[in-house]
């Protein structure tokens, strides 16, 4: 599913652990960067801002998949509305981010799961 975050288009893709790990190696080779150490890790979700893709493990139970999507969409929100730099956030800033992003993120999640939240 495609969605926009501050007029930047992203797509949500569900992949298995194996598919994601194979894709990461290919992407790293294409981008000319050091190959990611994905062999030993387990991913639930990952956001690739430069490619505009949010990956979610397709084998997660519905409740965990939903939480993971919210988590990844929060990364998108922070990147597109706040900053692309590493930053330490105070509790007050986190509360503001959560409150300000809630409707945007939950609308995308609702659309993705067809209202089955």
Which role does the model predict for each range below?
Residues 1-64, 76-80, 87-91, 100, ...:
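Active-site scaffold of zinc-dependent metalloenzymes
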Residues 64-72:
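Short alpha-helical catalytic segment bearing the HExxH-like zincin motif
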Residues 109-117:
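Long, well-structured alpha-helical subdomains associated
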């Amino acid at each position: 599913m495609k969605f926009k975050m501050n007029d930047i288009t992203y797509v949500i893709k569900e992949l298995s652990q194996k598919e994601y790990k194979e894709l990461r190696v290919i992407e790293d080779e294409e981008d000319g960067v050091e190959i990611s150490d994905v062999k030993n890790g387990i991913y639930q979700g990952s956001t690739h801002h430069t490619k505009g893709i949010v990956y979610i493990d397709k084998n997660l139970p519905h409740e965990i998949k939903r939480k993971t999507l919210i988590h990844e969409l929060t990364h998108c929100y922070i990147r597109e509305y706040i900053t692309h730099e590493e930053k330490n956030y105070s509790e007050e800033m986190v509360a503001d981010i959560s409150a300000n992003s809630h409707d945007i993120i939950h609308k995308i999640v609702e659309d993705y799961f067809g209202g089955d939240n």
